[in-house]
Amino acid sequence: LRGDYSNEHGFFVTPRAHLKYNPNEYVHFRLSAGKGYRTNHVLAENNYLLSSSRKVDIAKNLDMEEAWNYGASVSTYIPIFGKTLNINAEYYYTDFLKQVVVDMDSNPHGVSFYNLDGRSYSHVFQVEASYPFFKGFTLTGAYRLTDAQTTYKGERMERPLTSKYKGLLTASYQTPLGIWQFDATLQLNGGGRMPSPYELGDGQLSWNRRYGSFEQLS
């Protein structure tokens, strides 16, 4: 339990609880729940929008963001061929009570910042596995699913520019003396929703309503 005082928002209490249970040396369970507060600095945190030629409209008296967060995770350590396969799965749910909404849908030529009036939440599930195939070489894979929705002017929609899923595969090799390390990473970014487009003079949309998945190798 934590208490804070802000000269702008006054006194507030932040409760949080954590629970960990290890039934044996191979499986670990964790649960967490708590409340969080956050002051949003809209221009500093969304400065990429300043180069988009959108008109910026910031409402007065923006609230401090407030949300409940719940999480659960399980970690397993499985001995295979003298080495350990580590698998970790986790799920988090965030429910916003107060939030500063970044609205790029109401006006395709502008962006509005205002207090949430409705529901806003996110579900995130991620699974990760790592295994050292031989000395110095480790292969790690991860996959994440995200469902994030916010209410924009009375309509609850998927948050724009947020990928529905992401995948990552990393191969890492370190030389015997530990002087050099080489990494190869393959990343998959799933598609998502674009901000609402507008119609051009010929009736065509200014851009697609959704963007597709893409891969990146480095």
Question: For the regions a protein language model found, what residue spans apply to each?
Answer:
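Short sequence motifs at beta-strands and strand-loop junctions characteristic
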Residues: 7-11, 61-66, 117-121, 161-165, ...
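Outer-membrane beta-barrel translocator domains and adjoining extracellular loop/strand segments
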Residues: 9-15, 42-50, 55-57, 99-108, ...
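Gram-negative outer-membrane beta-barrel transporters
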Residues: 87-95, 115-198
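Hydrophobic, lipid-facing positions within transmembrane beta-strands of outer-membrane proteins
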Residues: 13-19, 58, 68-72, 123-127, ...
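Signature of Gram-negative outer-membrane beta-barrel scaffolds
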Residues: 1-27, 39-40, 50
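Transmembrane beta-strands of outer-membrane beta-barrel pores
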Residues: 1-7, 33-39, 48, 76-78, ...
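Face-selective signature of the C-terminal outer-membrane beta-barrel domain
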Residues: 1-9, 22, 83-91, 125, ...
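Membrane-embedded beta-barrel scaffold of Gram-negative outer-membrane proteins
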Residues: 22, 30, 61-115, 119-121
